[in-house]
Amino acid sequence: MPVKRQITEPNGVFFITFTCHQWKSLINLTKGYNLIYNWFDHLKTKGHFINGYVIMPNHVHALIAFRNSNQPINTIIGNGKRFIAYEIIKRLKELKEDKLLHQLHLSVEAKELERNKKHEVWEDSFDWKECRTNEYMLQKLNYMHDNPCKGKWNLAAAPVDY
């Protein structure tokens, strides 16, 4: 999974976004919300803090405070995406979503196939922004919480309802 930009700091608060491949609603289809929660729980056991998040049908926004990490933050996020992808594929197989699994397989690049990657669950890499001020963190929290209530989603009338 190529990384667009490396996070070079071992600590900090970051607004992270990662998206399902071709914006497919894989999280919703597989009822994979608990997979994200499990990853958050894992991060907490490592001393990191989940300051806010929203799990949408096809993407995740999270405000995460990474603390004293012995791994690069990009690696932590990449490992989380791999764990979640593995479980999503497992659920798609259980749901007998053969056509979708085939599409996800066809999306894997040749060099990734050589490394035994079988399905493309996520868009490459992830987006991130470092949050250096309380005002910026509040802006990102408000954006996340409003996300399900706006635009094409309209999944809830108010953030508290989602």
Residue positions per predicted region:
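Short catalytic/metal-binding and nucleic-acid-binding patches
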Residues: 1-162
